[in-house]
Amino acid sequence: MKLNVSFPATGCQKLFEVVDEHKLRIFYEKRMGAEVEADQLGDEWKGYVLRIAGGNDKQGFPMKQGVLTNSRVRLLMSKGHSCYRPRRDGERKRKSVRGCIVDANLSVLALVIVRKGEQEIPGLTDGNVPRRLGPKRASKIRKLFNLSKEDDVRRYVVKRLLPAKEGKENAKPRYKAPKIQRLVTPVVLQRRRHRLALKKKRLAKRKQSENDYAKLLAQRKKESKVRRQEELKRRRSASMRDSKSSDKSAPQK
């Protein structure tokens, strides 16, 4: 079995191939997320504590957190599940995944160093791989450099030196910096005030329209009521005229 060990403190990772089955027994029947003391792997691993992060079996199927078995299962997955990337909106698919319990059928086991031991491991703990990209969000930059809200974040952006072009080695060095997101500037505040002003304007216009409509509706109801009363009055007077004329035309005995 191969052990893919990473050390977040240095940013390094290294692949170790372990042939001896007895050394690997410390990982068997352990779940993903469990922390294991790695003294049994060899003298150089004395004092190290490793966390099981995942793995793949010999057919390439990945381990999935929360599936409490050491065999392979087929699960119906949708957007948001690990081990699955939907190709269309709302797509669901039944995929084969391995359970989160480690056994001998795995080909690669992913491990993370939680606690460093006594000795250095060449290529893993002795080197340092700097991050290629710095933080992009303003609050993350403030957190990284311990800045207050009054400090200017733009001065602390992590820039990356671009390689010089052929024939322009003596030119001025060029840097590439990310565009800071969620940065509060006077322009942003102005836009925010403009949006609030538009919102208030729309609200006032809507209230005015509602009031105008209510007035028009009341006027229409009043006009309809007056017309109905006039119609009833006209009918009543017409019926009274008809009754009087019928009384006059009736023969007297």
Curated annotation (Swiss-Prot):
- Mind listing the UniProt keywords for this protein, alphabetically? Cytoplasm, Nucleus, Phosphoprotein, Ribonucleoprotein, Ribosomal protein
Record PTM text: Ribosomal protein S6 is the major substrate of protein kinases in eukaryote ribosomes.
Which Pfam families does the entry link to?
Ribosomal_S6e
Give start-end positions of Basic and acidic residues composition bias.
Answer: 226-247
Naming one, the record's GO cellular component terms include: small-subunit processome
- What processes in GO biological process is this protein linked to? ribosomal small subunit biogenesis; translation
Which GO MF terms are attached to this record?
A: structural constituent of ribosome
Q: Where in the cell is it found?
A: Cytoplasm; Nucleus, Nucleolus
Identify the stretch(es) annotated as Disordered: 200-253
Q: Does the keyword Ribosomal protein apply?
A: yes
InterPro entries per the UniProt record, alphabetical: Ribosomal_eS6, Ribosomal_eS6-like, Ribosomal_eS6_CS
Top-level taxon of the source organism: Eukaryota
PROSITE patterns this protein is in?
Answer: RIBOSOMAL_S6E
What biological function has been recorded for the protein in this entry?
Component of the 40S small ribosomal subunit. Plays an important role in controlling cell growth and proliferation through the selective translation of particular classes of mRNA. Part of the small subunit (SSU) processome, first precursor of the small eukaryotic ribosomal subunit.
UniProt similarity note: Belongs to the eukaryotic ribosomal protein eS6 family.
Instruction: Describe the subunit structure.
Output: Component of the small ribosomal subunit. Part of the small subunit (SSU) processome, composed of more than 70 proteins and the RNA chaperone small nucleolar RNA (snoRNA) U3.
**Under which name does UniProt file this protein?**
Small ribosomal subunit protein eS6
What is the organism field in this record?
Spodoptera frugiperda
